[in-house]
Amino acid sequence: MPSIFEKYHLKQVINTSGRMTALGVSTPRPEVVEAAMAGMNQYFEMKDLVNKTGEYIAKLLDVEGATVVSCASAGIAQSVAAVLVKDSDWLLENLHVTPIENNEIVLPKGHNVNFGAPVGTMVALGGGKLVEAGYANECSADQLAAAITPRTAA
């Protein structure tokens, strides 16, 4: 049986950078692989699993709520959407249909990076408009405060 590199003509690399989206992010521990395999061979309502894992993680972290996401990009987009949608069922299903007045997301300039996808793109996918504050190597509380306007959502 050919390796994945041979089968798909992939270039094998040595990861000296740590966890990076461009390199597949991580190598799971054996117990994680085992848990995933067990889950893949069972049937259950995904909504129930999402809700219960969120409750479990929130309790572990002692926070109000938590949600498991598939990747950092999804987490950013979903977090922005949650801030904008709040409790509006209509907006939840029509996020990009109508302009949202208060959709600005303030972010220190140095945090607007491309980790496999630009943070600004994820903010836009979540319905937000990115507003950078400060500089790539510095962002003070005053610079953050100056970027906040009546249109700021977060």
Where in the sequence are the language-model features?
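Short glycine-enriched loops at secondary-structure junctions
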Residues: 110-113, 136
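N-terminal "arm"/small-domain region of PLP-dependent enzymes with the aminotransferase-like
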Residues: 1-43
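General beta-strand structural signal in soluble alpha/beta enzymes
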Residues: 14-16, 46, 50, 67-70, ...
